[in-house]
Amino acid sequence: MSIESNTALALAYFPAFRDRDAQWWDAHIAPGFVRHDPGLDFAVEGPAGIRKLAEVLHGGFSDIAYPILNVVAQDDRVLVHLRQVATHSGEYEGRPATGTRTDIEVMDLFRVEGDRLVEHWALMDNLNLLKQIGAVDA
């Protein structure tokens, strides 16, 4: 695929994740997909792993938006710098819903093979997120 196609695929991940689009995941997340994320205490592998990740995040947050700030692509890699803006509407990391509108920065690097995402490195500002919902002192 071209750099443009790879970029379009990586950017399409965010609305699909926000909308919990299982059809998109099955079509565009490789069976051997792996998400490398030091902030998670469980493995995210293949479409089933994305489903589990969505359950965890959507269980704690609603009204999620992913404003894209920057995109850089080279060969089979696409780096997306974005914000995750959401309402803390359910339990997350043991903290009950606060109704707080959260806003954190995220860096996602994707590796593409063909028309599928095969690898994902994610860095989220989890400390800032936990501060915003009152789970840790500011």
Q: For the regions a protein language model found, what residue spans apply to each?
A:
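C-terminal and inter-domain tail/linker signature
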Residues: M1-A138
